[in-house]
Amino acid sequence: MGLESHARISEDAEARILEEAVESSYRKGGINACIGEQEVSKETVMNKLHTLEFPLLEPLKEKRRVSRLYIDADEDHVSLQYLEKKGDIKRPRVNTVMPKLIYVYEDVNFDGSKHELVNCHYFGGDYAGTEGTKELWQEVFDFITESYDEEVLEKIYINGDGADWIRTGAGMHAKARFVLDRFHMHKYIISATSHLKDSAQDARSEIYKAINGKRKWAAEEAFDKILHVTEKETKAKAVESAKNYILGNWAGIMESVR
């Protein structure tokens, strides 16, 4: 037997609803909240989740004194069942949002088996559009200003894939610098060389040598050599895309080259 309409749910049951809904689904969250054969409807679980409000992250009680801060910024596709009410999505391609995630940390520790971010703090949500992006970054930089001694802080490194919204953040603080993350750099270099078979490693080495030597012109030449021996149009497009990506993010790559 299910709960009657408008029946009250205890705080303990609400907690179990939210825990299970985060891990699996609305339906299982409703089942997990009850004892015996009773269950809370998935619509009730959904309503509980949708009414949640998350306060802004409180600044640290005492300002910390560090010379460098690191920010990792990324986004992901999330599929929606609907936007505001069931049935309002008519086309499959419009049922996704791209929430943004930012985490601020002071360093990375390694204990021999895993890496751990030092004093990590998280920000994120569906901050859509230009104004949403600025609002999110303002929250991040307000937290930094209130939590860290600005006289000691020298640089803020923002790691990401080079998306416009990430670059916006790098332009909103005088001490912020955009850094292209290594994953995306390696991905594009591999994409540009994978078809070269036995020569692939040599071509990659030439690109990495140009990067480590801080020679942009040499990196451009390396990509042009690959294009010269690439016959298939589809692969040529991949090489051209990688070339534009690496050269277009050159300043961000150089921030991590010592």
Residues covered by each model-derived region:
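Catalytic center-proximal scaffold of phosphoryl-transfer enzymes
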Residues: 1-258
